[in-house]
C-alpha cells in the first residue's frame, strides 16, 4: 500500500503556487539574467505602482529628509502655518490600522498631544498653572489657559513668533520656532496685547489715521485706540504746572474723537473744529498756575502766545475758505509770529519786504508779548539785586 502511494506521488508531484503579488511582478518585469529563477521582490505603494525595494528605500530617505528639513513648509502641506495652528493634533485621525502617533499629524483618543481648536475655545497662549503642577486641570476645556506644550506654542499668537536657536541645523520633526526670516510671523499690535481685531473709529476716518501714525502727536489724548506707548512719551512735568495743559490736551482730544465719531467730516473740517475748540477755551487756569512761581514765567508767555496764535490762525482759516487759493499763500510760513501784531502783511514782491525787517518785526512782537505777560503776572522784569549790595557793604 505504501509503495502504491509513493508511486502515485511520483507521477503527480505537488506544485507550490506563489502569492498573487509575486505572480503580477513576474509577469510585469522579467527576471534578471544573473538570477533567472529568483524573481525580484516588489511592493505596492499608495499610488498603486509597483516599485522595487531599492526605489522604496530611496523614497523613504527622501521622505525622511523632507520631514527633517527646516524649510519643508514650502512643499509639505502638513507643515504650513495654517495647518500647524488650526489642524495639527486637532483633527481626528481616520486611519484604521495601527501606526506611530508621534509621526501622525492628527489627533488620537487618549493622546497627550491633543489640542483644543483655538477657533472654538477661547484660551490664551499662557500655560495653565494648575495643569503645570499636576498635569490636569479641573476646568477642562473651559480653561482660559493653554494645556500642554502643543497648545502653548502652536497657539496663533505664539507660533513662529521667535527664532529657533538651532537655525538651519534644526532636526525636530515639529518645531515651534522660525528658522528663516521668511518663516518669522509678525503679529499686529492688537493681537499681541490679546485684544481681538475690531474696526475702530480711527479706521473709518483718514484724519485719525494720520494723527495716530505719528508717535509724538499731541492729538492722541486719552483715546484707548490711539494711546502712545510709555517709551515714546516725554517725561511729565509737576502736576501744578501742567494740569491746565493736560486738560487742554484732553479737550482737544475730545474734539478730535467727536469729529471721528461723526465719520462724515474731512480733514479740513476736523482741523477747523480743533482750532475752534482751542480758541473758545480759557487759559486763565494755566496763567494762574504759572504765576505761582517766577520760574514759570516762560510758561505763561508761551500760553499767551499760544492763545493769540490760535485766534489769528482761526481767522486765517476762515479767510482761506472764503477766498480762492493764490501762490502768495504758500510763499509765507503760516506759523510765523508776525501775525501777532495788527500791522498789515507786507507784499512778497514789494521793497518793504526784507528778511531784516521781518526779523525785527518778529522780535518786536515777541518782546511786546513778554512785557504784557510780565505785567499781568505781577512779576518784575529786572531781578532784585539788593541782597548783593547788602553783602558787599
From Swiss-Prot:
PROSITE patterns assigned to the protein according to its UniProt record, in alphabetical order: ZF_C3H1
Any single GO CC term annotated in Swiss-Prot or TrEMBL for this entry: nucleus
Keyword Nucleus (UniProt): yes
Low complexity bias (residue ranges): 20-37
One biological process term in Gene Ontology: regulation of DNA-templated transcription
Assigned keywords, A-Z: DNA-binding, Germination, Metal-binding, Nucleus, Repeat, Repressor, Transcription, Transcription regulation, Zinc, Zinc-finger
GO molecular function: DNA binding; DNA-binding transcription factor activity; zinc ion binding
Record note on disruption phenotype: Increased levels of JMJ20 and JMJ22 in far-red (FR) conditions.
Subunit structure and binding partners: Interacts with MARD1/FLZ9 and RD21A.
General remark: Plants lacking SOM germinate in darkness, independently of various light regimens.
Name of the molecule in the record: Zinc finger CCCH domain-containing protein 2
Organism from which the protein derives: Arabidopsis thaliana (Mouse-ear cress)
Gene: TZF4
Amino acid at each position: 500500500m505504501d509503495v502504491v502511494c509513493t508511486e502515485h506521488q511520483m507521477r503527480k508531484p505537488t506544485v507550490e503556487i506563489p502569492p498573487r503579488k509575486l505572480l503580477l511582478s513576474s509577469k510585469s518585469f522579467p527576471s534578471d539574467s544573473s538570477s533567472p529563477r529568483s524573481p525580484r521582490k516588489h511592493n505596492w505603494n499608495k499610488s498603486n505602482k509597483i516599485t522595487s525595494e531599492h526605489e522604496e528605500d530611496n523614497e523613504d530617505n527622501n521622505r525622511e529628509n523632507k520631514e527633517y528639513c527646516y524649510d519643508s513648509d514650502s512643499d509639505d502641506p502638513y507643515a504650513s502655518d495654517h495647518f500647524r495652528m488650526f489642524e495639527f493634533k486637532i483633527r481626528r485621525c481616520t486611519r484604521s490600522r495601527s501606526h506611530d502617533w508621534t509621526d501622525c499629524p492628527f489627533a488620537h483618543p487618549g493622546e497627550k498631544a491633543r489640542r483644543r481648536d483655538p477657533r472654538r475655545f477661547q484660551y490664551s497662549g499662557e500655560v495653565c498653572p494648575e495643569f503645570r503642577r499636576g498635569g490636569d486641570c479641573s476646568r477642562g476645556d473651559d480653561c482660559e489657559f493653554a494645556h500642554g506644550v502643543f497648545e502653548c506654542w502652536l497657539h496663533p499668537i505664539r507660533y513662529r513668533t521667535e527664532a529657533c536657536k538651532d537655525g538651519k541645523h534644526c532636526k525636530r520633526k515639529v518645531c515651534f520656532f522660525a528658522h528663516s526670516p521668511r518663516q518669522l510671523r509678525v503679529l499686529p499690535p492688537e493681537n499681541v496685547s490679546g485684544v481681538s481685531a475690531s474696526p475702530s473709529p480711527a479706521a473709518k476716518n483718514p484724519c485719525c489715521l494720520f494723527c495716530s501714525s505719528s508717535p509724538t502727536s499731541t492729538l492722541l489724548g486719552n483715546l484707548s485706540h490711539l494711546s502712545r506707548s510709555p517709551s515714546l512719551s516725554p517725561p511729565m512735568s509737576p502736576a501744578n504746572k501742567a494740569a491746565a495743559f493736560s486738560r487742554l490736551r484732553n479737550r482737544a482730544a475730545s474734539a478730535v474723537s467727536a469729529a471721528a465719531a461723526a465719520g462724515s467730516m474731512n480733514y479740513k473740517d476736523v482741523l477747523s473744529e480743533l482750532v475752534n475748540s482751542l480758541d473758545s477755551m480759557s487759559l486763565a487756569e494755566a496763567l494762574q498756575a504759572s504765576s505761582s512761581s517766577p520760574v514759570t514765567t516762560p510758561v505763561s508767555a508761551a500760553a499767551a502766545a499760544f492763545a493769540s496764535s490760535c485766534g489769528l490762525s482761526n481767522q486765517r482759516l476762515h479767510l482761506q475758505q472764503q477766498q480762492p487759493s493764490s501762490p502768495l499763500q504758500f510763499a509765507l510760513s503760516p506759523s510765523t509770529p508776525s501775525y501777532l501784531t495788527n500791522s498789515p502783511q507786507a507784499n512778497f514782491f514789494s521793497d518793504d519786504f526784507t528778511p531784516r525787517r521781518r526779523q525785527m518785526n518778529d522780535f518786536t512782537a515777541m518782546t511786546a508779548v513778554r512785557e504784557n505777560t510780565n505785567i499781568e503776572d505781577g512779576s518784575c522784569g529786572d531781578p532784585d539785586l539788593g541782597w548783593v549790595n547788602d553783602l558787599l557793604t
